[in-house]
Amino acid sequence: MAKKLEAQGGRGGEEWDDGGAYENVKKVYVGQGDSGVVYVKFDYEKDGKIVSHEHGKQTLLGTEEFVVDPEDYITSVKIYYEKLFGSPIEIVTALIFKTFKGKTSQPFGLTSGEEAELGGGKIVGFHGSSSDLIHSVGVYIIPSTTPLTPPVSGGLTKLEAQGGRGGDVWDDGGAYDNVKKVYVGQGDSGVVYVKFDYEKDGKIVSLEHGKQTLLGTEEFEIDPEDYITYVKVYYEKLFGSPIEIVTALIFKTFKGKTSQPFGLTSGEEAELGGGKIVGFHGTSSDLIHSLGAYIIPSSTPLTPSSNTIPAQGGDGGVAWDDGVHDSVKKIYVGQGDSCVTYFKADYEKASKPVLGSDHGKKTLLGAEEFVLGPDEYVTAVSGYYDKIFSVDAPAIVSLKFKTNKRTSIPYGLEGGTEFVLEKKDHKIVGFYGQAGEYLYKLGVNVAPIAK
C-alpha cells in the first residue's frame, strides 16, 4: 500500500488527490504564471494504460514537460514555495523532479522561498491544493526494489547511458582495473569528444569517441590510489533538432576530487555512480549524445584503520576522503535551514599549503571559517547529527572544534545524537565522510602528537 506524504507549500485553494493506486508516473507537465507555478498535469500508468490528472489553470505561457524514461521512475520532488506579495497565502514557485536512475528535471519556475523535498521510494501519485495557482504538492510513495541494472558479471554493473538517442553506440566494456585519465573536447554546441585512459594489468589502454575540434581537449587526471565514483551528465536538444547532445560532464572521485564542469551545465541533468567506475559506454557522431558507465563495488578502506576514528552521522551522499596531512590549517563550515550542508578543510604537508576539496553544497548563508594559528592543531571534533524532515538519512546538524589552545563556537544548532571524534595524545591530520546536498557523516584521520 502506498504511503501518503504530507503536501508541502501553502494552505490556500482547494485540495485535490490523484491517489496512489498507479504503477508509475510517466510524464509531468508544469505551467508557470507571473508569480509561480499555476498548473500541473500528471500522466500515470495503470494496467498498461495512461491516466491523466490536471490541476490549476494554464496560462498563455503553456507548459513544460518532464518525461520519465522506460524502466525508470520518480524518486523525489523538490518544492519551493513562498507568500505572494501582500498576501498571507503561499504558492509553489518551482518544482524539480529526480528519478531513480539519476535523471533530474530543470527547475520548473524560480527557486525562491522555502524549500522542501518529498521522496524516499518510488512516487506513484500526487496530491495537493490549488486555485488558479498551485499552493501545495504532496506525494504517494511505495518502497523501491528495482535494481539499477542486472549485474554483468563478478559484481560488475552496467548503468544505462544518459542523454540523447542519436549517433552510433560504442562500448569500452568494464574489464579494466581503473580509469586513470579523462579527456573532454568541446565544440560550439556541447561536448564533441571524449577519451579515456584505462588501466589493465599495469598497462594503459586508451579509447576515444566523437570528433575533436580546433578547441582541443581538457583533462581530468585521477590521483594514485583514487578512482572515479560518479559522473554528472548534462544534456539537451540542439536548436531546431529533436536530438539531444551532452552539454557538460563533471567527474568526482572517491577521495573527493571534483573536476571542473567540462562544458555548459544547461538542460537536463543525470548522475551515474554508486561504486568504482571502471568503464564507459554511450553514443556519438561528431558529437557525444549520451554517456553510461560500468561500476564495481567499492571495497577500498578510507584510510588505515589504526589511524582512523570511525565516521559519525547518517549513511547518505557520496564518500569522500581528504587523506592524511601534517596538520589542519583552516576549516570552513556552511549551514542550511536545518543542518550542515558544506565542509572544507585546508591542510599543510611538508611545510606547503594544501587546499582542500569542497564537500556538500553551500547555501546562500555561505560558510564560516575557523583559522588555526602557528603551532596550533586540532585535537578533537564534537557535534550532533539528527534526522531532518524529508531527508532519508540523518545529517550533521552541528560541529565544534577543539585545539591545543582553544575551542571553537558551535557551527549549527546543538541537538540530536551527540558524538566526539578524538584519540588521546593524537592530533587530527585529515577528514573524511559522506556528503551530497548535506554533510551526512564526518570522520577523522589522526597522527601522534610529537613530544
UniProtKB/Swiss-Prot annotation:
UniProt entry keywords in alphabetical sequence: Acetylation, Lectin, Repeat
GO molecular function, one term: carbohydrate binding
Biological processes per GO annotation: response to jasmonic acid; response to wounding; vegetative to reproductive phase transition of meristem
GO cellular component terms attached to this protein's record: chloroplast; cytosol; nucleus; plant-type vacuole; plasmodesma
Record-annotated Jacalin-type lectin domain positions: 2-143, 156-297, 306-448
Disulphide-bridged cysteine pairs: none
Gene3D superfamilies to which the protein is assigned, alphabetical: Jacalin-like lectin domain
SUPFAM superfamilies: Mannose-binding lectins (SSF51101)
CDD domains to which the protein is assigned, alphabetical: Jacalin
InterPro entries: Jacalin-like_lectin_dom, Jacalin-like_lectin_dom_plant, Jacalin-like_lectin_dom_sf
Coiled-coil boundaries: none
N-acetylalanine sites (modified residues): 2
Keyword Repeat attributed: yes
Family the entry assigns: Belongs to the jacalin lectin family.
Assembly and oligomerization: Component of the PYK10 complex, at least composed of PYK10/BGLU23, BGLU21, BGLU22, JAL22, JAL23, PBP1/JAL30, PBP2/JAL31, JAL32, JAL33, JAL34, JAL35, GLL22 and GLL23.
UniProt-recorded name of the protein: Jacalin-related lectin 35
Organism: Arabidopsis thaliana (Mouse-ear cress)
